[in-house]
Amino acid sequence: MKKLIVSTAVATLLLTVPGMAKAEENKEDWDKPVFIKGADLEGQDLQQTEDDLGVKDDYETYSVTTDDVSKYIPNSGNLRYIYSSATIKHKKWGNGVDVEIDTPDNITKVTSEQYQNASITAGIKDAEIHIASVEKVTGEGALAGIYKAYEEKGNELNSEDIQNSNKEMQDLTSISKENQNKDGYSDEALNASIADIKQQLADIKKKQDEQITPQQVEDIVNKVLDERGLSGTLTDNQKQMITDNMTNVANSNALTSDPKAFAKNAKDALKGIEKNSGDLLDKAKDKAKDLNTEENRNFVQKIWDSILQIIQSIIDFITNLFNRIF
């Protein structure tokens, strides 16, 4: 009888542990939404920001200062004031990360797709994030505020994942700036590629216990950039920057600790980008086809030119030979 009781207790405990683990994993399911306000907001500017973000009385409020930006995004530069703000609402497990910039004209450096990819890299899960500012700003203050809010709520993100997230965002911003107005390029195409790569890396990790190799990362990066029409648009240096960032992601705590959830977040991000990008993604692919066709033409032309040169050389040789004889 005692054995039966003990066995039942053990079985109950074993059944309970996964639920406890899931509850621990989902402790980010906050009861109240969070409002992260730029520390320099006051009066009418604060009210306008709250209106833009739809902040209600039941929101928990945290302030983000220039010191916070220096702490969480150390390479952001010397910001003198913080106006960019954000809200975070948590969703049920498996619903991904959504980011919307409610004042797109005032966020000058970071796009919603970059925020989304950066959030996933940092290890944020199942969140609806809104960004806004009453003044034109880079938007880095809001991102630092998001990291701070997670720490304040007891859900501190892995510091290396945050560093990876910051580097990724800065590098993607740099790549976008360097390719701005280039035919066939779009920020949406780049960020769709990044989300696609992340999903495929997580899918690999789900199938293997060992660490993802650098060669696996490089193969996926090259394949995705080629499929999405960016291989011929980006420089070798830019491709290497992407490969380096994705290597960081492959080894990150965010991916390796829960590849299934990471893959789901990346997949949802990719779907969102594809849904909201219109024909921008197709334009990149079409441009790649045009470039490929032109390259093929040039290749064929070079072969034909070489053949003509050989024929001309033979003719010149024979002509010179006959001139010497006669």
Where are these regions (language model features)?
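Long, low-complexity, polar and repeat-rich extracellular regions
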Residues: 24-64, 75-78
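Sec-dependent signal peptide cleavage junction
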Residues: 15-27
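Amphipathic alpha-helical membrane/lipid-surface binding segments
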Residues: 259-314, 318
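Soluble oligomerization/assembly scaffold segments of membrane-associated complexes
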Residues: 120-233
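Positively charged n-region of N-terminal signal peptides that target proteins for export
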Residues: 1-4
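Bacterial N-terminal signal peptides
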Residues: 8-16
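Sec/Tat-exported extracytoplasmic proteins
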Residues: 53, 119-123, 149-157, 176, ...
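Signal peptide-directed extracytoplasmic domains
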Residues: 71-124
